[in-house]
Amino acid sequence: MAQLVKAAQAGFDEKNDALVTVEPIASGIEIEITSKVIRQYGDQIKSVILNTVKEAGYDGVKVIVQDKNAWDYTIKARVLGALERGSKA
């Protein structure tokens, strides 16, 4: 399992992007999403985040996403970038 050792961010708070913050927690994966399209796409956004964190082999992560209508691949890239920045080298 990969280990998150510090809080980190990736992305931008701009149109068609997402600002992703990851923070270490004791265990599990927590997801917090802020988005104008949460009613329509909230489940899909959450699924992309959860699958990305699991596929990368992390546990004990809180993911906070401020979505500005980002595509799935953008969200995935931002989550992976934040995880890498906050990981043990």
Which residues make up each language-model segment?
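N-terminal intrinsically disordered, cationic/polar leader segments
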Residues: 1-89
